[in-house]
From Swiss-Prot:
Catalyzes the formation of sulfite from adenosine 5'-phosphosulfate (APS) using thioredoxin as an electron donor. The gene is cysH. GO terms for molecular function: 4 iron, 4 sulfur cluster binding; adenylyl-sulfate reductase (thioredoxin) activity; metal ion binding; phosphoadenylyl-sulfate reductase (thioredoxin) activity. Gene3D superfamilies: HUPs. Coiled coil: none annotated. One of its GO terms (biological process) is hydrogen sulfide biosynthetic process. One of its GO terms (cellular component) is cytoplasm. This is Adenosine 5'-phosphosulfate reductase. Its EC number is 1.8.4.10. It is an enzyme of class 1 (oxidoreductase). Pathway: Sulfur metabolism; hydrogen sulfide biosynthesis; sulfite from sulfate. It holds the Pfam family PAPS_reduct. It is found in: Cytoplasm.
Amino acid sequence: MLTYETWEENVVSFSEEDETKGALSVLNWAYKEYKDEVVYACSFGVEGMVLLHIINQVNPSAKVVFLDTNVHFQETYELIRKVRERFPSLNIIEKQPELTLDEQAKLHGEKLWESNPNLCCKIRKILPLEKSLVVEKAWISGLRREQSETRKHTKFINQDHRFQSIKVCPLIHWTWKEVWRYVYKHSLPYNPLHDVGYPSIGCEKCTLPVGDGGDSRDGRWAGKVKTECGLHYQ
């Protein structure tokens, strides 16, 4: 089994000559390699809808973890309900932070997402995923190379130093148009915020719509140097 400790580059290759541009091949490998020791960390963005559809074909009882920061858009929570109806056998786990928002405010002050967004992300996203991955050998992410400069070198299979795990990224070669084409073709549910200028959807406090021609990540932590929550540190 390929693990963080036994990491080797290019130990497996994948065919990209199908509708999924390698994603189906990658996921078949991941569930064969790790069985029930792999989890998909899903933010329920539009890429997530594509991955959930393909994962459901490969492993209908797959584990899916959603990092519920308690400050997501209401539209995101409603989408999760629809996904549960569409894919009832998937094991969707809503992972909560240890601190409630009130407890966080007492310890670190009100609106931590404004005063120290890195700490807020650590408390509400990074630490919960870290705890989820303690019992897993690998995790799946919907990163695409096209999304931003920080993601353009992502590979199908990555040695993840942040969580000392294997990170599987099946959608690296997909374009934004291909993601949407797949969603429409398969009549998949998606977050309606995508229709009003939100290409990337995170917490409500830290996500704004993006103007025409903007980077898909421009609406995240707008006005701050920060462009990543920290889950995908390389």
